[in-house]
Every structure is written in C-alpha cells, then in structure tokens.
Regions:
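Short solvent-exposed coil/turn linkers within tandem alpha-helical repeat scaffolds
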Residues: 8-9, 39-48, 75-84, 113-122, ...
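Single conserved hydrophobic/aromatic residue that forms the stacking wall/gate
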Residues: 1-7, 11-12
Length: 245
C-alpha cells in the first residue's frame, strides 16, 4: 500500500508541475490533460488550482456547461474568500452565457450574498439576475434589481438598467412614470450614449401613447441631428418619423 501511495503521490505531483508548465507556455491541451489527471484524485492539495485552470479554458472555448460544473466544484471546495468569489463569478458568467435563467438567478443570488463583493461584481450580478428575471416574467423582482443598478448611470449596466426601468413602466402603460424616468436620465446624463439615445426613442413612444405626437416628433428630430453613431438608432428614428408624418 505504501508503495502505491508513493506512486500516486508522484503521479499527482508530476501532473501538477506539468499543468503549471502548460499554463506558463499557454499550452491549453497540456493544461486540460494534466488538470484532468489531477482531478481523478479529487482531494489533493492541487484540486482547486486544477479546477480554476480547466474551467478558465473551458469557458474561453465556450464550453459553458462544462465550465459551470467545474466552477460549482470549486465553490464547494474553496478554502479562501477569493477562490469562493472566483467560483461564484465563473458560475454566474457560465450560466448567463448559456442563457440558463434558473442557474443565472441562483448564481447571482449566491454571489450577492458574498460579504466582500466589489461594486463591479455586484453590478454584474444584479444585471444578469435582472435580465434572467425579465426572461422568466418575474417583472417585479427584475424591477428591484434594475432600480438598484439604475442609481449609477455612469456604468454601462446602470445606463442600460435606467432605460429598462422606463421600458418596463411603458409596457405597464404607466406613461407618466416612464416619462419622468427618462427625463431624469436625460438630466443625469451618462457616458453611454447608446442607452441615452434608446431612451429618447422610448420617450417618443411614450408621447405617442399619451397622444403628444408633436413632442414625440420633436425628440426624434433632435436625436437625429445630434446622434451619429453607426448602429440601429437611425433606423429606429426613421421608422417612427415615417409613422408620424
């Protein structure tokens, strides 16, 4: 037994060093091979590092279901806050990329329970959870997350959330509240011009619903003159102006 144990220990150590060398040389196949060998012995001192290395490659290769499985294992084994957070983040991103709403909501909720979460990771968790809630028609829960995000329109997630809050109000036929939300966004401003432009277009839709077609047209013309990015905004403006003739 002693000889076998020594043999397996040597095999584990060799696999670990080969995994590290593979990582340094950016040899993904070597990392996958040797991390896989290490993980055949689940309770080695190296299993967390092996899971981190393998999950990262699987995620980058878009094998999100396999990455999610590894990140879940890492979460269960993690011995430090940093590794637990890394696992939770990996779980969230993998689930979100798979568009698995149930897994995304679970991973985000798990992540938001972490004590030392950076504002960036908190925003990411709120954003992905809000989008998953919207997909699941859990509009009230989505609105809570979106409103929390929308407090800071300087971030990309915050800017999109501000627009989505107004969109939810518009869909609920709460036109006065939607108008107020968008005018507040315009006043606050944001470095993320696309979401501000989308909000101008939404405001024109709100005004059409309120039978203020002149105001709707004015906002569209103002946006047409001032927004010149190469995206889908121009088409949205033209479609609406055509209907307002």
């Amino acid at each position: 037994i002693g000889v076998r144990l020594v043999g397996s220990e040597m095999c584990i150590r060799d696999s670990y060093y080969l995994c590290v060398i593979g990582k340094e040389q950016k040899d993904e196949e070597a990392v996958l091979e040797h991390a896989g060998k290490l993980l055949e012995y689940p309770d080695t001192p190296y299993s967390q590092e092996a899971l981190i290395a393998r999950a990262e490659i699987l995620f980058n290769r878009k094998h999100f279901d396999q990455a999610l499985t590894d990140y879940k294992q890492l979460k269960a084994k993690a011995t430090t806050t940093e590794r637990r957070q890394l696992a939770a983040t990996g779980m969230l991103r993998s689930a979100a990329m798979m568009q698995d709403d149930v897994e995304t909501i679970a991973a985000a909720t798990d992540m938001l329970a972490e004590a030392k979460l950076t504002p960036e990771l908190r925003n990411e968790a709120l954003y992905f959870r809000a989008k998953a809630y919207l997909n699941q028609q859990a509009d009230k829960k989505a609105m809570n997350d979106l409103q929390a995000l929308a407090k800071d329109t300087r971030t990309l997630y915050g800017a999109e959330a501000k627009y989505l809050v107004a969109l939810q109000l518009y869909k609920a036929h709460e036109y006065a509240a939607a108008e107020k939300e968008i005018l507040n966004f315009i006043e606050q401003s944001t470095p993320h011009a696309y979401w501000l432009a989308r909000s101008f277009i939404l405001l024109s839709d709100v005004y059409v619903a309120m039978d203020k077609k002149l105001d709707a047209r004015q906002y569209l013309l103002s946006l047409q003159q001032n927004y010149h990015a190469d995206d889908d905004i121009e088409q949205m403006i033209n479609e609406r102006l055509e209907k307002l003739k």
